[in-house]
Amino acid sequence: MWVSSMWWPVLFLCAAFGAVFGNEVTLPVSVKFGDGLLSFSKNTNGLFYTINEQDGLTVENSISTGESNVARNNQEYTLTECSTNEEACVEFIINDVNVILKKDLSNRASSVSHVVVNSSTDGVRIGACVELGDGVDWFGGPEAKYQLWPVQDAQWNYTAYYTKEDDAVAIAEPYWLSSQGTYLYVNPATSMFIDQNYLNEGSLCIYAENVTPYRERNYTSLEYWIGRYEDPRTAHEAAVEEFFAKPTDVPDERMIAQPVWSTWARYKIYVNDTIVRQYAQEILDNGFNHSQLEIDDFWETCYGSLTFNTSDEKFPDIKGLTDDLHDLGFRVTLWVHPFINVDCTEYYSIAESAGYFAKDVNGTILTTWWQGENASVIDFTNEAAVEWFTSRLTALQASAGIDSFKFDAGEASWAPEPAVLTGNVEESPSIYTYQFARALATFGNGIEVRTGWQTQDLAIFVRMLDKDTSWTFENGLPTLITTLLVMNLAGYGFVLPDMVGGNGYIDGVLVSTQYPSKELFIRWLQANTFMPSIQYSFVPWDYDNETVEICRTYTELHEAYAPTIIEAMNALVANGTPVNPPVWWLDPTNSEAYNISDEYLLGEVILVAPVVVEGAVTRDIFLPNGTWRDATYGTYDIYEGPTWIYDYPAPLEVLPYFVESSYWETLSAGSGAFLPSSSLTAIYTSAILALLIQLFN
């Protein structure tokens, strides 16, 4: 909570055009700012300044220095007009605090306000609070463990906004978007904290403060943009064009079309040559396709050695293993992390003596991670450290026959804090993630990372953080969809969903395993089917033949629609449009669409409505604007959106999905490869018969 000595100048920022100003002023004072009114006042608590406009968007700005002298009666203030024909502008100066407000007047159909507040005072905290508003839905913000959609009810208690393990904030782009067509974008170089619905109920507050995990800077700065457009889609497209880098290409197409098979959830750390061979053979014996088999934790001699344990109990002939897997048609990928544990003495000593570890301002290099209480992490902002790390990986690829890598961790929070990193101090600490992803992307578009900061341009998969094996919004199945939507809105459309069924952790213990139920496993795969890739670890044949048949069918359906997924990815490359947008993307002024958190789109041509509620065999489906063909049962009935379909039958075998009519006609006129296979039709026929039996009984 704020201490009583703090003062809070407040800015209510709304639309405004033009200005009339003086220079030195005595408070209170009001001046014209376009068609708005800019008012400054003071009291014993400090300085307040307000802009009011008709549409009512409210942003409260605050500057706290602890011991304030701003309210002294003899204080002089300078208010200066800096407008041009295309931009309204006002500058306000008091002591070392400089506030600049600008508004773009070049387009009457939209408006963009740009606010910069700077102060060189030590210990200053600058803030801005957006009133979320009754009846207004908000989207965006960070990846989170409790991932809501929309996000206005999320709670954040004055937390540093950077990539971190805590709360699963692996994506931390400073961007929010409202259903009213408003976006908020904060300069990512800000020493940023957020507070939502905690200190100020009903508000999203952003702050700049130079305290841990941020290094001390010469000044404190809060810079942000607020764009106002006719609807959220138009606003998002403008924000992407202005602030987000577009990918340069699409990721590996085989990873898109065919599943990744990982040893992690099923076997945890208990992997060896025998288990990997058995796993591969099971995949083939059950008729499943594959892009690659990923050997996860624990294959090293010690954590950080990047050297296979070649004991008889582990991997006595790793090259022989990978050669055999290649002969079976598998590519082989390897789990890699950026840590070296202290007890991995040979490699730890080399890295320590060469200065390859990230350190804090006191020179401390120790950190902890989930497989090491005493460890250090490679500094990916250090070019020599990157060269040492990546050259060892390249040598490992050649000697062990490894095709690509799954890179874990990479969030800035793994470095000792506040970290001393190479590069612009204003970009620290998240510059660690920026350099981590870029260094490892040099291994090609078949890699995966799990974190991102200003790295939307990379042609690689970004994996969701580990999901829990549950039906709840506590990191369970429903958050597979909401996380997908949040990542897409942040510009990361090449999403690798976490493993089908979750990770099976018991009470958060990494080496324990509780299998998902049959129902949860099947519903998870169905929800995943039209996402960019499928990742298995738990397997369908651990259940029964019905599960195998259902899962094989949806795995094949995913591959059949891989060209559509790639089309959507190419649209992201060209235009920055999401690969998997929210439903409102096609109906951006329809308030009913804003709260749909259990449906998603593939591009603009497929609507997916999976069942994510335990025990449910029907669901209500919202179809946005457009003409839709019901592809679920192969009947291709036509629906005109926007409309609701209530109590749509969706027994366990069924994933409801709809194809945009003109796209369906294109598919029908082609090879028909995207239409339901005979096995899928058989499953749906069986499902219909089962429903009829239930009805008549």
Model-flagged regions — what are they?
Residues S4-G22, T681-F696:
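Cleavable N-terminal signal peptides of Sec/SRP-targeted secreted and luminal proteins
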Residues L13-C14, Q147, P676-S678:
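Residues at secondary-structure transition points
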Residues F21-S111, S119:
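Beta-strand-rich N-terminal accessory domains
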Residues E24-N45, C82-T84, N95, S106, ...:
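Catalytic-domain carbohydrate-binding cleft regions of carbohydrate-active enzymes
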Residues A669-I683:
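C-terminal GPI-anchoring signal of eukaryotic secretory precursors
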